[in-house]
Amino acid sequence: MGIHLVLFLFLASLRLALSQDVEHGLILVEGTQAIAETDDNFICATIDWWPHDKCDYNNCPWGNSSAANLDLSHPFLVKAIQALKPLRIRVGGSLQDQLLYEVGSLKSPCHPFQKMKGGLFGFSRGCLQMKRWDELNHFFNNTGAMVTFGLNALQGRHPSGHSVWRGDWDSSNAYDLINYTVSKGYKIDSWEFGNELSGKGIAASVSAVQYGKDLIKLKEVLNSLYNNSDLKPLLVAPGGFYYKDWYDKLLQVTGPGIVNALTHHVYNLGPGSDEHLDRKILDPEHLSKVEAIFRSLSETIQKYGHWSSAWVGEAGGAFNSGGRQISNTFVDSFWYLDQLGMASRYNTKVYCRQTLIGGNYGLLDTTTFVPNPDYYSALLWHQLMGKTVLAASSDVFSPSLRTYAHCSKGRDGITLLLINLSNETRFTLMVRDRVPVSSGGHENATKIHVENSFLSHLKRAFSWIGRKGSDVTFREEYHLNAKDNYLRSQTMLLNGVPLEFTNDGEIPTLDPLLISVHSPIHLAPLSIAFVVFPYFDAPACAAQTKL
């Protein structure tokens, strides 16, 4: 009886192993030249203005996460920002175009946002007290954050039907805020003009011609107020959804040197109420659709505004506060990291995640301030991925394997980001550069040859070993999985270990596995991996600035 049971269990386990697909492949990295470059500080997160009673789909997930009432003294918040130092924080969102500043000649009383029928987004105007502005700036200074602050771009305008707003922008209140900021010596890295007013807008829109004229006015304000300052903040705009004709016209109207960065928003997963968000996240075809926007914006900048650059100013995946029990769980990292990799390929300099805290899509839990899985994804990117982007491709047939390559951050070599969207296929991968070793033969350096023999891959895979750093026999691997293989888990595993605050309340160290460079990379189904090759021979990385 016992022998039969053992035999049954063996056969069952063998059947399970055989039922899991294994696909072998070769990843080629073009290390001779960069294809794109990000900013030194690519990772960014937002702090919004939504009050606690902002609700979507009978869910009110914002709590006290607004820039107006966030607990700036919470140790988890401070440590989370400092671990990403310098983290760019974009302060802004839907309500910023209804926000006044209690400074200078403002005559109206300074009240917080309140629910109001007929108001934009269902809220009244709000007001930022200078006491709170002081507190925010002291907080930013203490945590080492780089600040992008969104200004009210509707002040002075009037609605004229169909969500279109007309009239010149009234710069007086913004002037007083910026003047106060300069007088206090507060370091604002960039000022952003407006939120989601481009094209058709969301609740309101402004024509590209009018917007451009007002940006020229704002640039004059900045040049005047910062004339005697060592600080020279950037002007970024429009913080909206990308409409090609609108963005083209904006650059043509403003001309050279006005807009330092074009910001656009990404919510390519649709509404947070969608019951199939996780399916969209794991669908490679759906994830790839947004690539057309990155490509088109890059072309717009090359044609009309070479002095400018592309930023993702806000991206939460699913709009209306994100997907409940999706955007704050492990499965969202498939979307988030794929976005970071894809945006980088198109010279996106900055990528701002909606949000640092607040809504369902916060990097930190709104109530406990404990990091959600995407926080650790951002932290790994911040620690490992340099600003120089390399071309990476593979001969894997499955579209479920997503591959991105950068020069490593602050050291020699390269770092790969590998994403496996398949729930069935395990990938066994070799890595090599595209530059062939001279051996008397000829090899096409720009085309991947699909071969049936995995051993052939193995023989070719380490052509770079010996040309540089031949004494290094290990690579670093960081494998990310969901706890208990439950994709909606709020706990991420790094190499099998849960990522949680230490007993001392510190962010955990992100320790890699050291794997022989002579062995293949094994990427499990529904997993993500960062793989660092410390001495991969990539000439494009030689000149990379050490951070």
Regions inferred by a protein language model and the residue ranges of each:
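Substrate-binding/catalytic cleft of secreted carbohydrate-active enzymes
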Residues: 197, 201-206, 265-293
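Non-catalytic accessory regions flanking glycosidase/transglycosidase catalytic cores in CAZymes
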Residues: 2-261, 290-313, 317-547
